[in-house]
Amino acid sequence: MKGKNYKIVSLYSFFPFQENLILDLKNKLIEIENENDLSGLFIFANEGINGTICAEKNVIDIVINLINTYTDNKNLNIKVNFSKNKVFKKLKIKIKKEIVTMGIPEINPSENNGTYIDSADWNKLIKNKNTIVIDTRNHYEVSIGTFQNSINPNTKNFSEFPKWVDDHLDTHLENKDSTNIAMFCTGGIRCEKATTLLKKKGYKNVYHLQGGILQYLDDIPKEKNLFEGECYVFDKRVALDQELEKGSYSICHACGMPVSIQDQERKEYRKGIQCHFCIDQFSEDDRKRFEERQKQIDRLKVENHKIHKE
């Protein structure tokens, strides 16, 4: 498997997805996985599909064509990237109440959402003095990169976003009826659902970046790029740089926070055991458990290296 050029596809679609069809698609994807090197994560719900998958191009094509038959060949938002290595261990398929959890069942992006803004027009919108820009991602994602002058709601998860809107959004608006509200996220799904929430609450000029940060970085040359830092992704790569290559961050396997090269040089950092974000979060028993886990990981790496050399 080493040296293969893997295709990584992030995709989502909001559409009415019936229970029997969800189970049918799940079973067909498992069949494809059994016969091919397919990995990633799918989340299915009655509101649609959300997922990121990794495989060779021909396998990806099979999966996309299959999914399109369930979405009636429309509204499947796709972002493509490549990697020399697999970015997931295996394929996971989860069936949930929502494909991205906001916790408000009546929010339905397939019926009413904000206005899509493509990458080419995004810079103009966010430079407009009558526009506020909101990063709808989690605080640890925002911490490693975001758009210039964007507002950070500082949420731990997306389900906290509605409360932030109720408590804080109006304080950022000069006029609820005339101020532009531009929102973005990694691939477009969270900001799309966020626009539906705001439209339901009566906000009028609501926009979201089509395809999210990933599409923007793919479309806009570096010299015109207004995104600063790296973009967090939910796979082994941890973060992507401005060229959509693997970035400089790693994950602290104790707390899950992204840690930079500089963070790893701090005295608090112990690989797999703790970082400066979580040094006060865990007990000594926890750390002993983390240390043993890291030793097992290191042993497996050595064994796998020997196998490949042979």
Swiss-Prot record:
Organism field: Prochlorococcus marinus (strain MIT 9301)
Entry keyword set: Oxidoreductase, tRNA processing
Enzyme Commission designation: 1.14.-.-
Protein name stated in the entry: tRNA uridine(34) hydroxylase
Domain of life where this protein originates: Bacteria
GO molecular function: oxidoreductase activity, acting on paired donors, with incorporation or reduction of molecular oxygen
Keyword DNA-binding: no
InterPro entries: Rhodanese-like_dom, Rhodanese-like_dom_sf, TrhO, TRHO_N
SUPFAM superfamilies: Rhodanese/Cell cycle control phosphatase (SSF52821)
Biological processes, Gene Ontology terms: tRNA modification
Residue ranges of every copy of the Rhodanese domain listed in the record: 127-225
Described function: Catalyzes oxygen-dependent 5-hydroxyuridine (ho5U) modification at position 34 in tRNAs.
Top-level class of the enzyme under EC nomenclature: oxidoreductase
PROSITE patterns: RHODANESE_3 (PS50206)
